[in-house]
Amino acid sequence: MALIYSFLTITLRVNQNVTGLALTTFGIGVGNFFGGSLLSFFGETGSISLLKTGNCYKAKLPFADNLGLFGKTFLSLGFLAYLAIIIALVTSYVLNRTRTGLNLRAVGENPATADAAGINITKYKYLSTLIGGAVAGLGGLYFVMDYTGGAWTNNGFGDRGWLAIAIVIFAVWKPGMAILSSFLFGGLYILCVYIPGLSSSAKELINMLPYVVTILVLVVVSMRKKRENQPPAHLGLSYFREDR
């Protein structure tokens, strides 16, 4: 999917926002189609369960339960959760401390200047988009194998993909901040589970909190107008070399 998006937006220079929305809808349909085919094949009606495989992804450190609340909170997660933190830390280091990362940031800020400096704009855009797509795929794998215990259900992801976009905005495009934002948004998202006696409407209102917080952050960031808190200047825009 990331390769299709890259080809359409980088090579053909189609509008990135429209392409993203179209592929999101397309991806949901493809997932439900193949999921429905597997349901028919296995004779199930609501979900496909891969509990044994899911349990492998949910395996936790054997000594986590012996460390009390700290162990249960931070050391009892599946390995994909820790892998996500490692990926964010490595990404932060690469973007801020390596030549490749600085070149990539230059492409995002001002591709014309980067192109004039000899940076291959197309290569960096393809590489970053494909890596981002792979990381997003790992997020989907985590949801199916760890969060839901290896069970596939049509439309089971709900709005969690949009929650990831909200986290990126809240973290002002900084991978290190995204780690803390993920914990905050995750806590807000499941807050209704730990508040007894809530009506269904109240639960939905609480589930809106991450998005409300994101809007507030956008307002504050736009008012302060600090350069370090702004998104990449060329975010969402196609690069036309002939206009350089």
What do the PLM-derived regions correspond to, one by one?
Residues M1-V30, Y189:
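Alpha-helical transmembrane segments within multi-pass membrane transporters and channels
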Residues L3, F7-T11, F33-S37, Y93-R97, ...:
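Membrane-interface helix caps of multi-pass small-molecule transporters
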Residues V14-L23, G46, N103, N155-F157:
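Cytoplasmic-side transmembrane-helix entry/capping segments in multi-pass membrane proteins
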Residues I28-N32, A81-S92, G132-G140, A164-F170, ...:
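Hydrophobic core segments of alpha-helical transmembrane domains in multi-pass membrane transport
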Residues V30-N96, A202-I206, P232-R244:
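Transmembrane helix-bundle core of multi-pass membrane transporters
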Residues T73-A151, P175, L180:
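Helix-loop-helix "hairpin" substructures at the membrane interface of multi-pass membrane proteins
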Residues E109-A116, T122-K123, I195-R244:
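Cytosolic-side transmembrane-helix boundaries in multi-pass membrane proteins
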Residues A136, D146-Y211:
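Transmembrane alpha-helical segments in multi-pass inner-membrane proteins
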